[in-house]
């Protein structure tokens, strides 16, 4: 129904619906960012034997992130004298905008989606790569050696892990016969691809953590090595753009893993009475929890280990997975 309205003859009602749905998605994502950060701090606190935020907004610290955001907005916005001012100002926007653009092709249920394009997976991968341009630009424009090194690390990491990420997703595309995300979910009606493609799921999840610059692959902003990495010279709301982009991508990547490998909104066979939106939310939250669990568990790897793992381990395994998938599909389907 919603898709028919969006694709019908342009009019004021379509425009109002378009902006209304966009505002709704923005509100949902911002709510996730707000309480996703809180959940991450609480979960990590529990795993480390701490309480976590418990002062602002009651005993559970429900308003702690809101207070942190207000603090960021009230901080002074400084620009280094030696910085390339236009590029320094533009870089956070370049990093932030693609994070929202990728949400347009993510189907959250069989009825709630914004753009049902035939190459939704390709669109996601292509647009998400643009954020690295903003990261590198911010590191270079800051005229700071730590920021520049962080930006270069981000570029090298993205190039290295984008390849196994894409190649692991090719196994899913081979089984589904489409790069349309809705079709990929439909192909998992009987068997989720996490069972048909366990190796691809493992490769994709590891590469996704690297793409998100999260522990143990957070080398572009390694505090113990680079102070704060590519955004070391940023403060206030400009720094908030980089942080917001990181957590919006966490939202998007968790949703993409749910779509590609966990059956999207399809339920477990004997629990079909539960709505698809609830199933999607449960799977999505499980993926987010695993990503938080990684951060609280693994130590940061060295730069040489990061590169070797991508090129010597993940890339060969992704090639093996493609060959096995092609053979199985040719012989049994």
UniProtKB/Swiss-Prot annotation:
Keyword Transmembrane helix: yes
Intrachain S-S bonds: none
Transmembrane segments: 15-35, 88-108, 117-137, 165-185, 191-211, 241-261, 274-294, 313-333
Localization in the cell: Cell membrane
InterPro entries in alphabetical order: NADH_UbQ_OxRdtase_su1/FPO, NADH_UbQ_OxRdtase_su1_CS
Keywords, sorted A to Z: Cell membrane, Membrane, NAD, Quinone, Translocase, Transmembrane, Transmembrane helix, Ubiquinone
Enzyme class (EC, first level): translocase
UniProt GO molecular function: NADH dehydrogenase activity; oxidoreductase activity, acting on NAD(P)H, quinone or similar compound as acceptor; quinone binding
Main location: membrane
Biological processes per GO annotation: aerobic respiration
A GO cellular component annotation in the UniProt record: plasma membrane
Membrane topology: Multi-pass membrane protein
Catalytic activity annotation: a quinone + NADH + 5 H(+)(in) = a quinol + NAD(+) + 4 H(+)(out)
UniProt EC number: 7.1.1.-
HAMAP family, sorted: NDH1_NuoH
Assembly, per entry: NDH-1 is composed of 14 different subunits. Subunits NuoA, H, J, K, L, M, N constitute the membrane sector of the complex.
Similarity annotation: Belongs to the complex I subunit 1 family.
Function: NDH-1 shuttles electrons from NADH, via FMN and iron-sulfur (Fe-S) centers, to quinones in the respiratory chain. The immediate electron acceptor for the enzyme in this species is believed to be ubiquinone. Couples the redox reaction to proton translocation (for every two electrons transferred, four hydrogen ions are translocated across the cytoplasmic membrane), and thus conserves the redox energy in a proton gradient. This subunit may bind ubiquinone.
PANTHER family the record matches: NADH DEHYDROGENASE SUBUNIT 1, NADH-UBIQUINONE OXIDOREDUCTASE CHAIN 1
Name of the molecule in the record: NADH-quinone oxidoreductase subunit H
Organism: Geobacillus kaustophilus (strain HTA426)
């Amino acid at each position: 129904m919603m898709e028919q309205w969006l694709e019908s003859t342009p009019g004021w009602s379509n425009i109002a619906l378009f902006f209304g749905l966009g505002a709704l998605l923005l509100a949902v994502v911002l709510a996730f960012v707000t309480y996703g950060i809180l959940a991450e701090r609480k979960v990590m606190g529990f795993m480390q034997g701490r309480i976590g935020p418990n002062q602002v907004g009651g005993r559970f610290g429900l308003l702690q992130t809101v207070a942190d955001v207000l603090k960021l907005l009230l901080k002074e916005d400084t620009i280094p004298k030696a910085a390339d001012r236009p590029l320094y100002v533009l870089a956070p926007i370049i990093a932030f905008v693609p994070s929202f653009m990728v949400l347009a092709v993510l189907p959250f249920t069989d009825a709630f989606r914004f753009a049902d394009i035939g190459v939704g997976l390709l669109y996601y991968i292509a647009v998400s790569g643009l954020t690295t341009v903003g990261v590198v630009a911010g590191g270079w424009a800051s005229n700071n050696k730590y920021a520049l090194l962080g930006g270069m690390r981000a570029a090298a990491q993205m190039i290295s892990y984008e390849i196994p990420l894409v190649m692991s997703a090719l196994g899913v595309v081979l089984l589904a016969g489409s790069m349309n995300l809705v079709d990929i979910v439909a192909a998992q009606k009987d068997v989720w691809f996490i069972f048909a493609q366990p190796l691809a799921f493992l490769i994709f999840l590891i590469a996704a953590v690297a793409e998100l610059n999260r522990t143990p692959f957070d080398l572009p902003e390694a505090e113990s090595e680079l102070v704060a990495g590519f955004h070391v010279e940023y403060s206030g709301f400009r720094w908030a753009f980089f942080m917001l982009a990181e957590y919006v991508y966490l939202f998007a990547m968790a949703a993409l893993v749910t779509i590609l490998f966990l059956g999207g909104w399809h339920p477990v066979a004997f629990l079909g009475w539960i709505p698809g939106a609830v199933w999607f939310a449960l799977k999505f939250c499980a993926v987010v929890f695993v990503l938080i669990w990684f951060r609280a568990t693994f130590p940061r790897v060295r730069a040489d280990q990061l590169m070797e793992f991508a090129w010597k381990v993940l890339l060969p395994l992704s090639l093996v997975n493609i060959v096995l998938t092609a053979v199985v599909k040719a012989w049994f389907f």
